[in-house]
């Protein structure tokens, strides 16, 4: 999954939930995890057997640690869901060439030199403002689980196959 900005409007949470429901109904997350090939830490391919998944259980149950499930997504399904395009997420078969910009102003299309800019005084003081955490801009490629915006544990997909391959 590649993060990028697109010129389409922002998504509401309901439309994204609807898209996820459509993916689920299309058979991506059924009660069984199909046979998959997964790469182990030493680079060898192994075949993962079918495993029964309990409702609400993590989809990679039965998969060795360090490997992630591979989910096949029909390209036609994604074409039908164009209205669910997110300004922050783009599904792509290619790895990103560079990390996403931290701020919208770093986008080349947004940088318009003729636009008016607000002037700031030199030596601007920041009284009472303290950094809560360090900002880090980098691609994370080794995560297998994460916490969503509602605080629920979710599985991060390592690969999404598109098309009939």
Curated annotation (Swiss-Prot):
GO BP: cell surface receptor protein tyrosine kinase signaling pathway; modulation of chemical synaptic transmission; negative regulation of neuron apoptotic process; nerve development; nerve growth factor signaling pathway; neuron projection morphogenesis
Pfam families: NGF (PF00243), NTF3_N (PF19338)
Annotated signal sequence range: 1-3
GO cellular component: axon; dendrite; extracellular space; synaptic vesicle
Transmembrane segments: none
Localization in the cell: Secreted
Keywords linked to the UniProt accession: Cleavage on pair of basic residues, Glycoprotein, Growth factor, Secreted, Signal
Annotated family: Belongs to the NGF-beta family.
Matches recorded under PANTHER family: NERVE GROWTH FACTOR NGF -RELATED, NEUROTROPHIN-3
Purpose of the protein: Seems to promote the survival of visceral and proprioceptive sensory neurons.
Protein name: Neurotrophin-3
